[in-house]
Amino acid sequence: MIVLQAYIKVKPEKREEFLSEAQSLVQHSRAEEGNAQYDLFEKVGEENTFVMLEKWKDEAAMKFHNETAHFQGFVAKGKELLSAPLDVVRTELSE
């Protein structure tokens, strides 16, 4: 199992647009085969800082996700929504 935590800093004026885009991404990603979890949380005490928590069955499932239209669209849109580059932490859980 692959676990990704993506720390996302959003421009304050783009917050609502980001949340709308992220909600769509979460919905589509959860429907993918190989996805075990896909959730967005706002970091406590840090307004406009979010954590996307993803769990994938294996490398192939994660690779497939990274190539989907909904993920690629979110990444492209992120350039105008984010105030800092993504900080992604990857861990692997033994089964």
From Swiss-Prot:
Induction: Strongly induced by stress due to exposure to 6-brom-2-vinyl-chroman-4-on (chromanon) and less strongly induced after exposure to 2-methylhydroquinone (2-MHQ) or catechol stress. Its EC number is 1.-.-.-. Putative monooxygenase that may contribute to the degradation of aromatic compounds. PROSITE patterns: ABM. InterPro entries: ABM_dom (IPR007138), AI-2_Isomerase_LsrG (IPR050744), Dimeric_a/b-barrel (IPR011008). PANTHER family: ABM DOMAIN-CONTAINING PROTEIN (PTHR33336:SF3), QUINOL MONOOXYGENASE YGIN-RELATED (PTHR33336). Belongs to the LsrG family. Pfam families: ABM. Residues 2-93 form the ABM domain. GO terms for biological process: catabolic process; response to toxic substance. It comes from the Bacteria. GO terms for molecular function: catalytic activity; monooxygenase activity. Keywords: Aromatic hydrocarbons catabolism, Detoxification, Monooxygenase, Oxidoreductase, Phosphoprotein. This is Putative monooxygenase YcnE.
